């Protein structure tokens, strides 16, 4: 791959906010509207095609939760788009995560947030973080999410440095079930699978979160071609700007598992003490160099084979989530009673939760 040939039109940092006023997305009643999506202080609703032009107003009675029901406990995450607070329901005492995103941002980012709300509204899976309700008020979107008290897999990895194979298999099995649901039931490519987007809790659950850059396809064989997501975990076909499918998420999963097993990101910079000069250098390495592999002298043949099945350079050669669930690396531990809950809690309190927006 020639220097400078890498997706020349890509913008690797957010452009300054555009001139489109937020009022473009608001109805006369102050409801945030994007196509079939309506969000106001009373909740969120997806309207039918016949209602898009003249949708009815969301009523408070449509939803069981409202922002006034929650009391802020502390800030547990910050990002460019806003903050995440730990909140407690005043009447039940239950804890939730409240993600608050200011909407005075560029139009494309508002579109991403609207897409995230649609996916949150329609997804119901034990391996995907639950979104209970969303609101729009005072220029901000607020999303009530399931609180995962173990933080993210990235937080956990900072504490334990590496994760043994048997625990990785149990973690991976849950992630694969979540990906199977997204890919085959909802036709969604996550497009930003990474350790910080996998959340854990004290009972051993592992759940996928953050659908801000996800794509919804028309079918299980559909393709996308938009360049979004975290560059480190991006598949070669996505970096090259070509069409890609659900197996781009499988590439990302392979890198995540290899990082968890070895304790380091699979692609090392030429000068280890200096890091990558820029993101283009990293992406050119991902495209030009052979795919990373698990050192056979450190890991089982089953794990090495699993990683290889995930990080094939040609997406057609990668196994699907469903196929990977039958891989020996996953099935070899089926008879063992692997207590992820105890393993997660043994490392102590989480460093943070939902640290990226």
Swiss-Prot record:
Interacts with SIPK. The keyword Kinase applies. Gene3D superfamilies: Phosphorylase Kinase, domain 1 (3.30.200.20), Transferase(Phosphotransferase) domain 1 (1.10.510.10). Its EC number is 2.7.12.2. It comes from Nicotiana tabacum. It comes from the Eukaryota. ATP binds at residues 76-84, 99. One of its GO terms (biological process) is defense response. The keyword Calcium does not apply. This is Mitogen-activated protein kinase kinase SIPKK. Induction: Induced by tobacco mosaic virus (TMV) infection and wounding. Keywords: ATP-binding, Kinase, Nucleotide-binding, Plant defense, Serine/threonine-protein kinase, Transferase.
């Amino acid at each position: 791959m020639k220097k400078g040939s890498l997706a020349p039109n890509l913008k690797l940092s957010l452009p300054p906010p555009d001139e489109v006023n937020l009022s473009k997305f608001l109805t006369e009643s102050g409801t945030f509207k994007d196509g079939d999506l309506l969000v106001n202080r009373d909740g969120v609703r997806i309207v039918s095609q016949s209602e898009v032009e003249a949708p009815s107003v969301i009523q408070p009675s449509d939803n069981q939760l409202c922002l006034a029901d929650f009391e802020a406990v502390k800030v547990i995450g910050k990002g460019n788009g806003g903050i995440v607070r730990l909140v407690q329901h005043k009447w039940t005492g239950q804890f939730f995560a409240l993600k608050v995103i200011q909407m005075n941002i560029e139009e494309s980012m508002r579109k991403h947030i609207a897409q995230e709300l649609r996916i949150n509204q329609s997804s119901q899976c034990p391996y995907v973080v639950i979104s209970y309700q969303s609101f729009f008020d005072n220029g901000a979107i607020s999303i009530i999410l399931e609180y995962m008290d173990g933080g993210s897999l990235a937080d956990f990895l900072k504490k334990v440095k590496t994760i043994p194979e048997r625990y990785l298999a149990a973690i991976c099995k849950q992630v694969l079930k979540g990906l199977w649901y997204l890919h085959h039931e909802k036709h969604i490519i996550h497009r930003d699978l990474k350790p910080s987007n996998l959340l854990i809790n004290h009972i051993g659950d592992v759940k996928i979160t953050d659908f801000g850059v996800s794509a919804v396809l028309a079918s299980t064989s559909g393709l996308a071609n938009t360049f979004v997501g975290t560059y480190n975990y991006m598949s070669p076909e996505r970096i090259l700007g070509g069409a890609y499918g659900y197996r781009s998420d499988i590439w990302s999963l392979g890198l995540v598992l290899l990082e968890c097993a070895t304790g380091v990101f699979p692609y090392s910079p030429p000068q280890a003490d200096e890091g990558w000069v820029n993101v283009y250098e990293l992406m050119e390495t991902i495209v030009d160099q052979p795919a990373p592999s698990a050192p056979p002298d450190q890991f089982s043949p089953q794990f090495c084979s699993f990683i290889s099945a995930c990080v094939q350079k040609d997406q057609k050669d990668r196994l699907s989530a469903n196929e990977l669930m039958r891989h020996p690396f996953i099935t070899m531990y089926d008879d063992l009673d692997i207590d992820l809950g105890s393993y997660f809690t043994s490392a102590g309190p989480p460093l943070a939760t939902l640290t990226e927006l």
